[in-house]
């Protein structure tokens, strides 16, 4: 009986330690962004298309200056649509009411052409932006990203500009 009590107590202590470590890994701060997105998409080499749509992201902070971000967008033209789902690290620093940031993201991209082919590609992106605090947890964001895809076995280098509202928590 004493041995069983010792095993149960040891398991309880181990679970308490593991639970404490796990809770330390859960982000306690971050932000949510939603806004307008403009994508200068290079579908065919040397031929760019203007796409307009939306961009949304969720960032969880693991340190005061580093977080993990998930970013999704959808941009649309007269006969074309492109969607990206990106994930990666973001570094930032708050200086008064502004928070500049830089990010490196990877993920998947999908392009669809009306009455034509569609394709899905690996995507990598690098960029940055600036959040300007308006009041309390509310800020406005300006963001510019270089996005690299390989649709239809060709390399594309797009520029995406996004702006909108950020809620910091």
What residue spans do the PLM features occupy?
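Secretion/assembly modules of Gram-negative surface proteins
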Residues: 23-25, 29, 57, 90
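A short, acidic/glycine-rich surface segment
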Residues: 41-44, 111-114, 149-151
């Amino acid at each position: 009986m004493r041995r069983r009590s010792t095993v149960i107590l040891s398991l309880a202590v181990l679970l308490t330690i593991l639970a404490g470590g796990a809770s330390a890994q859960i982000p306690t701060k971050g932000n949510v962004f939603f806004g307008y997105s403009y994508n200068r998409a290079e579908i065919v080499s040397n031929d760019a298309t203007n796409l307009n749509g939306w961009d949304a992201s969720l960032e969880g902070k693991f340190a005061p200056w580093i977080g993990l971000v998930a970013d999704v967008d959808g941009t649309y033209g007269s006969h074309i649509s492109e969607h990206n789902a990106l994930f990666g690290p973001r570094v930032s620093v708050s200086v008064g009411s502004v928070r500049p940031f830089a990010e490196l993201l990877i993920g998947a991209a999908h392009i669809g052409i009306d009455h034509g082919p569609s394709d899905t590609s690996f995507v990598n992106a690098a960029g940055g932006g600036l959040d300007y605090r308006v009041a309390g947890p509310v800020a406005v964001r300006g963001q510019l990203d270089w996005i690299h895809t390989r649709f239809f076995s060709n390399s594309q280098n797009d520029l995406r500009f996004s702006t909108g509202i950020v809620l910091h928590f």
